[in-house]
């Protein structure tokens, strides 16, 4: 079967997410680059890059979309017990590139990573611009878990997470949700559903509904103190 995709050029143009393929679900465009400007344009329009090593850059907007309503975060009984007795510390924007680097490391189930050096360089710039943020989990001075993503107005677009201790990435997500709730941020974009995220309360929304929410939230903004480096109390 022949697949027709828009090939991106040097402009920042993206086709409408509604033009994405149904198979593979959400594939919208190919090519372009991972410059900070293009990444921002993509995320502000409900599009994200995802590709394997040695593939061209692929851009996606799946239907349905994986989203986590912050108020509906699910904390299992076992995770709640861990949370109640933990001595771990949680911070925002204390070690952004360390988190990105940890997320880019090979996983047990795969040696591949889509977090390329170009992607990491662009995210470093986005962090300096105040657009990209991280949550860190610390055991004393050791970074044992975390996540990072991009703020699009009052929508947080999660990119990746990691853990070096059991449940550390889940605890990072709990910390993020509680932090966002203090600033009335209602939604985290998780891109695509999976069994791990489903246990945390991630839902599948029709793309059209996600795009409606995105259109509203991208016009709002966090106060500056939201993303200042800080220690989080859970």
Swiss-Prot record:
Q: Which GO terms describe its biological process?
A: protein catabolic process
Query: What EC number(s) would the UniProt record show?
Result: 2.3.2.6
Keywords, A to Z, come to: Acyltransferase, Cytoplasm, Transferase
Annotated Gene Ontology cellular components are: cytoplasm
Q: Does the keyword Transferase apply?
A: yes
* Record localization: Cytoplasm
An example Gene Ontology molecular-function term? leucyl-tRNA--protein transferase activity
Q: Which Pfam families match?
A: Leu_Phe_trans (PF03588)
> Its catalytic activity?
N-terminal L-lysyl-[protein] + L-leucyl-tRNA(Leu) = N-terminal L-leucyl-L-lysyl-[protein] + tRNA(Leu) + H(+); N-terminal L-arginyl-[protein] + L-leucyl-tRNA(Leu) = N-terminal L-leucyl-L-arginyl-[protein] + tRNA(Leu) + H(+); L-phenylalanyl-tRNA(Phe) + an N-terminal L-alpha-aminoacyl-[protein] = an N-terminal L-phenylalanyl-L-alpha-aminoacyl-[protein] + tRNA(Phe)
Superkingdom of the source species: Bacteria
InterPro entries noted in UniProt: Acyl_CoA_acyltransferase, Leu/Phe-tRNA_Trfase, Leu/Phe-tRNA_Trfase_C, Leu/Phe-tRNA_Trfase_N
Query: What role is this protein assigned?
Result: Functions in the N-end rule pathway of protein degradation where it conjugates Leu, Phe and, less efficiently, Met from aminoacyl-tRNAs to the N-termini of proteins containing an N-terminal arginine or lysine.
The family assignment reads: Belongs to the L/F-transferase family.
Q: What is this protein called?
A: Leucyl/phenylalanyl-tRNA--protein transferase
What gene name is listed for this protein? aat
């Amino acid at each position: 079967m022949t697949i027709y995709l828009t090939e991106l050029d040097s402009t920042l143009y993206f086709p409408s997410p509604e033009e994405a393929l149904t198979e593979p679900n959400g594939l919208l465009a190919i090519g372009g680059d991972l410059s900070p400007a293009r990444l921002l344009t993509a995320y502000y329009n409900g599009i994200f890059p995802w590709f394997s090593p040695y593939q061209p850059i692929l851009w996606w907007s799946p239907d349905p979309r994986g989203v986590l309503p912050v108020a509906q975060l699910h904390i299992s009984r076992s995770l709640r017990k861990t949370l109640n007795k933990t001595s771990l510390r949680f911070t925002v924007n204390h070690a952004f590139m360390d988190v990105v680097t940890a997320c880019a490391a090979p996983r047990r189930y795969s040696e591949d990573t889509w977090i390329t050096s170009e992607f990491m360089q662009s995210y470093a710039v986005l962090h300096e611009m105040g657009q990209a943020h991280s949550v860190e989990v610390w055991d004393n001075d050791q970074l044992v878990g975390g996540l990072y993503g991009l703020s699009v107005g009052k929508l947080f677009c999660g990119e990746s997470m990691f853990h070096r201790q059991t449940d550390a990435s889940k605890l990072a997500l709990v910390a993020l949700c509680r932090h966002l709730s203090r600033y009335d941020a209602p939604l985290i974009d998780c891109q695509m559903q999976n069994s791990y995220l489903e246990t945390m309360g991630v839902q599948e929304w029709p793309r059209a509904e996600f795009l409606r929410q995105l259109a509203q939230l991208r016009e709002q903004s966090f106060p500056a103190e939201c993303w200042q480096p800080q220690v989080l109390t859970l």
